[in-house]
Amino acid sequence: MRSMGFLHRACRAPSSLPAPLMARPGRSVLARPAATPPGPLCATTRPRPPQGNQPPASRISNFPPKRHKTRVLAAAEDEVSAAVAALISAHGRRHHSLNNQAAAFHGQFAQNLNVGAGSCASAETTADAPTQALLGPADRQRRQRRAVRQWLVRWAAHPGRATRGFHNHRQ
C-alpha cells in the first residue's frame, strides 16, 4: 500500500516501523512515500468484521461498536512527532465534536420535517372535508368504479347478460 508516509507512520508505534523506513543519516523519514506493511495503524483501530456465508445483517450485528479515532500515537519519541500527533489528535477531537453537532442538527431537522408533514396532512384533510361530505367517502367511490369496470368487462364478453348484473352492485 503506497501512501504519503508520515500519515501512516504517525499512527504507528516506533517499534512497529520496518527497518527500511527508519531514519538513515542524511535522509528524512517524512520526505518520501513508502510502502507500509499491513497491521494496526492507530491506537483505536477496529478489528475486521467476521467474514463467511452469513447474511450482511448478521455480519453488521456481529461487528463491534464503533470507536472514534481521536488519539494518534507519536511515530517516534521526539518533540516533532509528539507535536504532530497532538495536532492530528486535536483535529480528530474537533471533527468528532462537529460530527456529533451535525448529527444532532440532522435529527432535529428530520423531526421538524415529520411534524410539518403531519400538520400539512391534517390541514389538507380538514380542508377536504366538505368535498368528501359532498362526494362521499373514497372507499364508496372505489367500489363504484370497480363495479363499473366489472360491468364493462362482462358487457364486452356477453353484451346481453352484462346489464342484468350491474344493478346488483349498486349501493
UniProtKB/Swiss-Prot annotation:
Q: Does the record's keyword annotation contain Secreted?
A: yes
Mainly localized where?
Answer: secreted
- Motif segment (BH3-like 1): 73-78
Stretches the record annotates as Disordered: 32-65
Q: Which residues form the PE domain?
A: 70-126
Superkingdom per UniProt: Bacteria
- Keyword field contains Transcription: no
Can you cite an annotated GO cellular component? extracellular region
Q: Which InterPro entries match?
A: PE-PGRS_N (IPR000084)
Which positions carry the signal peptide feature in this UniProt record?
1-23
Q: Name one Pfam family in it.
A: PE
Chain positions of motif BH3-like 2: 134-139
Q: What does the UniProt keyword field contain?
A: Cell wall, Host mitochondrion, Host nucleus, Secreted, Signal, Virulence
Q: Where in the cell is it found?
A: Secreted; Secreted, Cell wall; Host nucleus; Host nucleus, Host nucleolus
Q: What does this protein do?
A: Essential virulence factor involved in regulating host-pathogen interactions by regulating multiple host cell functions. Interacts with host TLR4 receptor at the macrophage cell surface and promotes activation of the canonical NF-kappa-B signaling pathway to stimulate secretion of the proinflammatory cytokines TNF-alpha, IL-12 and IL-6. Strongly induces apoptosis by inducing pro-apoptotic factors and efficiently activating the reticulum endoplasmic stress-mediated UPR pathway.
Record text about domains: Contains 9 predicted calcium-binding residues and 2 typical BH3-like (LXXXXD) motifs. The hydrophobic, disordered C-terminal domain (amino acids 120 to 166) contains a BH3-like motif and has similarities with mitochondria targeting proapoptotic eukaryotic Bcl2 proteins. This C-terminal domain plays an important role in modulating host mitochondrial functions, apoptosis and host-pathogen interactions, but it is not required for mitochondrial localization.
Its quaternary organisation is:
Interacts with host Toll-like receptor 4 (TLR4). Interacts with host cell nucleolin.
> What family is this protein classified in?
Belongs to the mycobacterial PE family.
Q: What is this protein called?
A: PE family protein PE6
